[in-house]
């Protein structure tokens, strides 16, 4: 009996030594529970600050460029400028500064729900006409246009995300938390839609798109 136990120990000893050597020199890296969120950066490589103002600029120059600005929507009866546009070139006026207001926390991360607000002096009447939202479907353009008149913390029409572009810079997404059926463009796994550009009365208007999202950068003011 003792002889059998001795032989068994001799057989198991190399396996134990190999296992110890393998795990110490070649540790098994198990995947983490969730990826570490990345902070959104401005054109200087600084982390975006909810208390700072930024211009949303294009990643392209010349006729392909152009900053985002607040303008009057065609045929609108709103008492204040209520459209989110992009200049037709980066040569000319600068865009309207915005600030980003995260749903929670004091930092701005990629793929995080937030509100976007034009950060400009305004009269009391126009206070709500600085907060971005997505309007109803425009039958002529067959899309949903970005406009102002939103509400901070409003779940259905005023929440956006900043995500890394597959090309360069960042993309903006519109992400309603509820009533997804009201957004036929919100087709990804998170019920978000890409923000791009359409032409409205000769102007570049920000709108929801299926392809060619707008690649942007954030320049601190």
Swiss-Prot record:
GO terms for molecular function: aspartic-type endopeptidase inhibitor activity; serine-type endopeptidase inhibitor activity. Residues 24-32 form a propeptide. Residues 1-23 form the signal peptide. Pfam families: Kunitz_legume. Keywords: Aspartic protease inhibitor, Disulfide bond, Glycoprotein, Protease inhibitor, Serine protease inhibitor, Signal, Vacuole. Induction: By wounding. Also expressed in upper non-wounded systemic leaves. It comes from the Eukaryota. Tubers, leaves. Disulfide bonds join 80-126, 175-186. The record marks 144-145 as: Reactive bond for chymotrypsin. InterPro entries: Kunitz_inhibitor_STI-like_sf, Prot_inh_Kunz-lg. One of its GO terms (cellular component) is vacuole. A motif (Vacuolar targeting signal) lies at residues 26-31. PROSITE patterns: SOYBEAN_KUNITZ. Belongs to the protease inhibitor I3 (leguminous Kunitz-type inhibitor) family. Inhibitor of cathepsin D (aspartic protease). May also inhibit trypsin and chymotrypsin (serine proteases). Protects the plant by inhibiting proteases of invading organisms. This is Aspartic protease inhibitor 7. It comes from Solanum tuberosum. The lineage of its organism: Eukaryota, Viridiplantae, Streptophyta, Embryophyta, Tracheophyta.
